[in-house]
Amino acid sequence: MKNNIILFAVATLALNSCGIYKKYEPVATLPENLYREEIAPADTFSIGNISWRDLFTDPALQSLIERGLANNTDLRIAHLKVQEAEAALMTSRLSYLPSLSLDPQGTTSSFDKAKASWTYNVPVSASWEVDIFGRLTNAKRQAKAALSQSQAYSQAVQTQLIANIANLYYTLLMLDRQYEITTETAVKWQESLRTTQALMAAGMTTEAAVSQTEATCYSIETSVKDLEQTIRETENTLAVLLGETPQDIERGRLEDQSLTPDLAIGIPVQMLSNRPDVRSAEYALAQAFYGTASARSNFYPSLRLSGSAGWTNSAGSYIVNPGKLLLSAVGSITQPLFNKGANIAQLKIAKAQQEEAKLTFQQTVLNAGKEVNDALTQAQTAKGKIDLRTHQIESLEDAVRSTQLLMTHGNTTYLEVLTAQQTLLSAQLSQVTDRFDELQATVNLYQALGGGRH
């Protein structure tokens, strides 16, 4: 008896050393220098922990996000994937319990016209696999990791959805403002056209100048039509993202938007714990880890206990009434012999899949760092450009007024006026784009740090 206990203990240690029962250990280290030196974090706060309602305070945008969270088809599919994973986990947990079956049978027979005899069996059978070699345990752990992955994926879809809705909303506001500027410019150019025609009538300019002004007016009016089309297309895209049919989108104004949180990014470990896609990739790695352990357990025998209990009136060649209680119990051990090659192949596949999952996780972390760096660079660049663009527009407005005055008195050419006005329009449109870039950078940083989870 003592020798058997020692043998069992040695076998258990051997199995543990093979990794059959070993639990997955979460990745605790990240690549060094995940952030560039000029944007390295100085504290542990991260805007990724802010609720999306606290970040996006525009009531119209909040309403759109709520509609998207309720109706977006991709997010609803992700929620269904979570339900599927929950059911799979329940199945793996139930595999620890014995399986029960009821198999009643009855037979009537008569030999040589003798009186018919009736026999019956009413057994209840039970079968239970004893999880000595970790097959069921690893299957349950793998299913649990799959559930966690599906939950993280659902959160990643939600984060992406909120960011996409916000970016499309701000795109609409940018287009609205550019439409206003271009429309106002078209009106001013019509005035310039009338002025140029009057100057030509007075002999102070040429017909070529009038033709050039007309061409510029048509060009600006064409830009207005292009902006109208782009606005409609963007509205349609946003409506589909909300899970709704194309429609007009109620919205505010670009000038009224304010996203001014402290753009703190937190330490890399925080970012890792916040981003749902990173968590999803790590849970996929855990799944692959337990898949490898399951493949190893296939090399070991399986122990199954089975038994039955019930009533029968058939006792061999005798029939007794009333029936008697019948009990039976069987224990069996099945050791794979001829499918070892298949098991080896499955283990190689599992190891390769685990390595693939590891590389995918590493790449996901690198992508996360890149997205944070890109968003911060975009925010810093946009802020600097806005300040410079303001001074540029002030100078261009002075230049337009000066050249128009000079042309009225015949002291400059029409080309200088045309150039100044076109440059001013371009700068005004670029200023709107810079403001959009600043808003988009905050949205992208919020998403990159795992924001939108709550």
What are these model-derived regions, one by one?
Residues 18-36, 66-131, 233-249, 262, ...:
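A small-residue-enriched
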Residues 145, 152-267, 378, 382, ...:
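Periplasmic alpha-helical coiled-coil/stalk elements that build and connect Gram-negative outer-membrane
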Residues 208, 411-433:
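Short terminal targeting/anchoring segments
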Residues 1-16:
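Sec-dependent bacterial lipoprotein signal peptides
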Residues 200-204, 407-411, 448-452:
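A short glycine-centered flexible hinge/capping loop motif at secondary-structure junctions
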Residues 76-77, 93-94, 130-158, 208, ...:
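Sec/SRP-type N-terminal targeting helices
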Residues 39-67:
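Regulatory alphaC helix of protein kinase catalytic domains
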Residues 7, 19, 23, 259, ...:
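Acidic, low-complexity, intrinsically disordered peripheral segments
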